[in-house]
């Protein structure tokens, strides 16, 4: 529900109503809501409860722009510093995913993040990696939205690794930029469509939080 925008951005979650709808007790529901808050899908305010996350396109743009800049720099450093063996290990990590069969959306996202962390790690710059990890935590919510494109991401990751192995620094940096920009464009498109839907859905009888 949180990912599919069942709740309007900023809307307060009615725990009693939601528990009845899902046919669960308040305790497991509260645990689930706390977990969703930790993962960035919801926000919480003391003495007021849980709220659907507000969509902040400008902030997302800034974070994705920064991420693209940093990862381009990282792959340039990786082309210069990573050993052939280290690049081979990264490629093996990707190939192992081909043999893992069907996996959940959550696992797809974890593997996607892990690839980018390993890629940036090849720059041998720990502060760069820490910054990219921090950005990933802040955009994880948005990346959930676009989880259906993970198969395409996997193919692009393999291409990035091939360019890295061939030490094609400029081409690799350009491809990483296009890779990140494409996902951001897809996320924005999905968000725009979702916002249009949730604000026109049941417009004659909007739901009220109790």
Swiss-Prot record:
PROSITE patterns: HTH_GNTR
InterPro entries: GntR_C (IPR011711), TF_FadR/GntR_C (IPR008920), Tscrpt_reg_HTH_GntR (IPR000524), WH-like_DNA-bd_sf (IPR036388), WH_DNA-bd_sf (IPR036390)
Domain of life: Bacteria
Ranges of residues in domain HTH gntR-type: 1-55
DNA-binding region location: 15-34
GO MF annotation, one: DNA-binding transcription factor activity
Keyword annotations from UniProtKB, A to Z: DNA-binding, Transcription, Transcription regulation
Pfam family, one: FCD
Function: Probable regulator for the expression of the NTA monooxygenase subunits.
PANTHER family, per the entry: GNTR FAMILY REGULATORY PROTEIN (PTHR43537:SF45), TRANSCRIPTIONAL REGULATOR, GNTR FAMILY (PTHR43537)
Name used for this protein in its record: Nta operon transcriptional regulator
Organism: Aminobacter aminovorans
Taxonomic lineage from the root: Bacteria, Pseudomonadati, Pseudomonadota, Alphaproteobacteria, Hyphomicrobiales
């Amino acid at each position: 529900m949180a990912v599919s925008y069942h709740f309007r951005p900023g809307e307060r979650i009615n725990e009693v109503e939601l528990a009845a709808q899902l046919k669960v007790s308040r305790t497991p529901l509260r645990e689930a809501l706390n977990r969703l808050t930790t993962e960035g899908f919801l926000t919480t305010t003391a003495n007021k409860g849980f709220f659907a996350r507000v969509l902040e396109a400008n902030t997302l743009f800034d974070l994705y722009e920064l991420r693209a800049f940093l990862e381009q720099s990282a792959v340039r450093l990786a082309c210069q510093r990573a050993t052939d063996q280290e690049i081979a290990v990264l490629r093996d990590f990707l190939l192992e995913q081909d043999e893992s069969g069907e996996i959940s959306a959550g696992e797809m996202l974890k593997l996607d993040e892990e690839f980018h962390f390993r890629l940036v790690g090849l720059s041998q710059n720990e502060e760069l990696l820490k910054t990219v990890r921090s950005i990933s935590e802040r955009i994880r919510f948005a990346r959930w939205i676009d989880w259906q494109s993970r198969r395409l991401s996997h193919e692009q990751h393999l291409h990035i690794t091939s360019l890295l192995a061939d030490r094609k620094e400029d081409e690799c940096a350009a491809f990483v930029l296009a890779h990140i920009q494409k996902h951001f464009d897809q996320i924005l498109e999905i968000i725009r469509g979702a916002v249009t839907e949730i604000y026109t859905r049941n417009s004659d009888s909007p739901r009220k939080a109790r």
